[in-house]
Amino acid sequence: MKEYDYLFKIIVIGDSGTGKSSLLLRFADNTYSESYMSTIGVDFKIKTVKIDNTTIKLQIWDTAGQERFRTITSTYYRGAHGIICVYDVTNKLSFDHITETWLQDIDKYATSNVCKLLIGNKIDLAESRVVSADEAKHVAEQNNMNYIEASAKTDSNVEKAFTTIAKALKDKVTQYPSNAPASTVSLNTASKVPTNRGLTDSCQESSVFKKMNFSSGKCT
């Protein structure tokens, strides 16, 4: 029996302190800690979700937001199928940096039709809020992004956020049903190498991902 139908790489970007790691830990492990330290470098989690009877494995990369790590994290844009931009609704600067920094990085390093999601985190801090939902929705609409407000602390809309981008990716793939590739092999197969569709014996990517202009960076 196949383990999953699709494997997608998603990266989570945004300023340090916006709660990227907390969102990922809440989604992947259902845990939350007030004392979680800022990510140094890059870490990732794997989570399998079921959408419309399709099993999707998400490989989610948690990138460091600090400026000094920007040269490290930029290498992870290539091959990403989806990108989640996170800002803190109580921190206007983190929101401004979405357009001033992070979306510019996406344009520079990611594929042109990568799926994007904007998350306004920390909505549990309503009294300290400085970024309105309307402001964020405007930015999302201008940049062809879905928008969701969430709280890693209270677990509000966290699963919805990640499943939203997973569904968007699945819908992109299934736009080309006649070219849909066969089911992928297990991640535990040591002899395999990673590609956009999962793992394969050779550096050959499926035609559906070529149509989507996705490159894993392994077959160049």
Curated annotation (Swiss-Prot):
<feature type="binding site">
    <location>
        <begin position="62"/>
        <end position="66"/>
    </location>
    <ligand>
        <name>GTP</name>
    </ligand>
</feature>
<comment type="similarity">
    <text>Belongs to the small GTPase superfamily. Rab family.</text>
</comment>
<keyword id="KW-0636">Prenylation</keyword>
<dbReference type="Pfam" id="PF00071">
    <property type="entry name" value="Ras"/>
</dbReference>
<keyword id="KW-0547">Nucleotide-binding</keyword>
<dbReference type="GO" id="GO:0005886">
    <property type="term" value="C:plasma membrane"/>
</dbReference>
<dbReference type="InterPro" id="IPR001806">
    <property type="entry name" value="Small_GTPase"/>
</dbReference>
<feature type="short sequence motif" description="Effector region">
    <location>
        <begin position="36"/>
        <end position="44"/>
    </location>
</feature>
<keyword id="KW-0472">Membrane</keyword>
<keyword id="KW-1003">Cell membrane</keyword>
<feature type="binding site">
    <location>
        <begin position="14"/>
        <end position="21"/>
    </location>
    <ligand>
        <name>GTP</name>
    </ligand>
</feature>
<dbReference type="InterPro" id="IPR005225">
    <property type="entry name" value="Small_GTP-bd"/>
</dbReference>
<dbReference type="InterPro" id="IPR050305">
    <property type="entry name" value="Small_GTPase_Rab"/>
</dbReference>
<comment type="function">
    <text>Protein transport. Probably involved in vesicular traffic from ER to Golgi.</text>
</comment>
<keyword id="KW-0449">Lipoprotein</keyword>
<protein>
    <recommendedName>
        <fullName>Ras-related protein Rab-1</fullName>
    </recommendedName>
</protein>
<keyword id="KW-0653">Protein transport</keyword>
<dbReference type="InterPro" id="IPR027417">
    <property type="entry name" value="P-loop_NTPase"/>
</dbReference>
<dbReference type="GO" id="GO:0003924">
    <property type="term" value="F:GTPase activity"/>
</dbReference>
<dbReference type="GO" id="GO:0015031">
    <property type="term" value="P:protein transport"/>
</dbReference>
<keyword id="KW-0342">GTP-binding</keyword>
<feature type="lipid moiety-binding region" description="S-geranylgeranyl cysteine">
    <location>
        <position position="219"/>
    </location>
</feature>
<keyword id="KW-0813">Transport</keyword>
<feature type="binding site">
    <location>
        <begin position="121"/>
        <end position="124"/>
    </location>
    <ligand>
        <name>GTP</name>
    </ligand>
</feature>
<dbReference type="GO" id="GO:0005525">
    <property type="term" value="F:GTP binding"/>
</dbReference>
